[in-house]
């Protein structure tokens, strides 16, 4: 292994050990309506943050309504948020992307990202519903 590659691997290991890797959690915009599945994602992000990790809530649009109206401002202020609309995400091999199963259609768009991808299954009923015809989770 060349020196540059070895340095990159060592830097990635250091980033993981120091809990600096970004953990992107994709959340849908409920437009201010309470939804248990979204609260769960925020609870996971909050727990990760309190454990010293680096969670970031990802959402689709810049006009994300957030959860302040039904969860209070603690979640909106405590956890960083980032829109994927018109922006380039900085994704590294040591990062994680957590997608709820309702965003199965997004997996095809992110399959080439260098990070680990995790499907958060909150309802098995949606597990296959959002995949394109002929696709399986094993492809991702």
Functional labels for PLM-detected ranges:
Residues 1-96:
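N-terminal pre-catalytic "stem/leader" segment of glycosyltransferase-like enzymes
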């Amino acid at each position: 292994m060349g020196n540059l590659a070895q340095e990159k691997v060592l830097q990635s290991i250091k980033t993981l050990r120091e809990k600096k890797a970004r953990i992107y959690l994709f959340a849908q915009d409920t437009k201010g309506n309470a939804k248990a599945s979204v609260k769960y994602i925020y609870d996971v992000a909050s727990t990760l943050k309190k454990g010293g990790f680096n969670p970031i809530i990802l959402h689709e649009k810049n006009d994300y309504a957030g959860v302040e109206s039904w969860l209070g401002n603690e979640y909106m202020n405590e956890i960083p948020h980032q829109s994927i609309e018109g922006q380039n995400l900085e994704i590294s091999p040591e990062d994680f992307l957590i997608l709820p199963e309702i965003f199965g259609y997004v997996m095809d768009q992110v399959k080439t990202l260098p990070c680990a991808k995790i499907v958060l299954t909150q309802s098995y009923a949606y597990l296959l519903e959002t995949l394109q015809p002929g696709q399986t989770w094993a492809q991702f």
